Amino acid sequence: MARYRHSRSRSRSRYQRRRRRRSRYRSQRRRYRRRRGSRRRRRRGRRRGYRRRYSRRRRY
């Protein structure tokens, strides 16, 4: 049983690492897309996005 548990935890850590990398790439792409948007819309979205990013960094 212990052996099975160990293998499971190992696979989970690997999956977690991959997930983090993917989320980072996705957020980057979204930012680029927003920048291309209209100026008025960009200002509003940028402020909201910055707040979210700051909170995430603090948590980390």
From Swiss-Prot:
Q: Which InterPro entries match?
A: Protamine_P1 (IPR000221)
Question: Which named protein is this?
Answer: Sperm protamine P1
Give the record's family classification: Belongs to the protamine P1 family.
Q: Tell me which PROSITE patterns the record gives.
A: PROTAMINE_P1
The tissues in which it is expressed are: Testis.
Entry annotated with the keyword S-adenosyl-L-methionine: no
Give the UniProt subcellular location, in the record's own words. Answer: Nucleus; Chromosome
Q: What's the main place this protein lives?
A: nucleus
The gene it comes from is PRM1
What superkingdom heads the lineage?
Eukaryota
- What does the entry give for GO biological process? chromosome condensation; sperm DNA condensation
A cellular component annotation (GO) from this entry: nucleus
Q: What does this protein do?
A: Protamines substitute for histones in the chromatin of sperm during the haploid phase of spermatogenesis. They compact sperm DNA into a highly condensed, stable and inactive complex.
Any one Gene Ontology molecular-function term assigned to this protein's record: DNA binding
